[in-house]
Amino acid sequence: MRRLPVLLVLLGAACGRGPGPQAPVPQSVNAALEQFLAAVKANDLGKMSSLWGTDRGPASQWMKTNELRQRVTVIQKYLDHTGYRIIEGPLAVPNRADLRSYRVDLQRTGCNQAVPIDVIRTRSGGWLVYDVHLEAAGSPGGRCQPASGTRQ
């Protein structure tokens, strides 16, 4: 019977804390892109939220929950793919030592779509997807849009 009060105190302390520790951000620029695109393909919005952000860190740590869910839902719809191929990158971005840019060929049913994706180095040293350039991704579910260097 003595164990019950101790157990209740421990449970109370564990429940009183904020959210658990966040998964560490990828330590390489390539891993950030690969993990993000895998999360897009798997429709894993939670994982996408932890791999997309700014130099401050993952959006899941600082963005309001409803806004974040809406944004990653839109990103997932626009970047949904059956496979991908890195066309070029990581490329340095002029005057931005913290950014690297890729051109990614998203493989979709019936076509491929080239999309630029920027990855940023966080203040803590990891890498996150920063800008997915949705304007280049074409309409979700629609025909692929012509883009330079892309075969239709």
Description of each model-found segment:
Residues M1-A13:
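Sec-dependent bacterial lipoprotein signal peptides
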Residues R3-L4, G18, T122, Q152:
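Positively charged, low-complexity intrinsically disordered regions
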Residues C15, G53, P58-A59, A137, ...:
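Functionally engaged cysteine thiol sites
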Residues C15-A42, S50:
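Short, low-complexity N-terminal intrinsically disordered segments enriched in polar/charged residues
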Residues Q22, P26, Q61-L68, G125-W127:
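Intrinsic-disorder-associated interaction segments
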Residues N30-A31, L45-S101, Q107:
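Short solvent-exposed beta->alpha transition segments
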Residues R85-Q152:
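Exposed beta-sheet edge and beta->alpha loop/turn motif
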